[in-house]
C-alpha cells in the first residue's frame, strides 16, 4: 500500500511539474528515495522508466496544444519542458510516429 501511495505522489508531482526541467534527482527526492532505487521502483510499478513516463506526459500535452492552438512548434516545445527543439522533434516522432509539424497539419 505504501508503494502505491509513493507512486501516486510521484505521478502527481510529474503532472504538476512536467513543464519544468525535471531531473531524476528531483523525481526521486519527491518520494524520499535514492535515484537508483527510485528508477527500479518506478520501472517495477509502471513498466517504463521515469524519464520515459515524463516525456510521454510532455508529448501528450504538446499534442493537445498542437491541435487546439495556433502556437508555434517551438513555443509548444519550450512550454512543455523541452529546452531543445531537435530533441523535442525526435522524442515526438518516437512516441507518435510523425513529426510535430505533420501532427499539427493532420
Ranges and model annotations:
Residues 1-4:
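Intrinsic-disorder/low-complexity linker and hinge segments
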Residues 9, 13-15, 21-57, 71, ...:
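Basic/polar phosphate-binding segments, predominantly the helix-turn-helix DNA-binding elements
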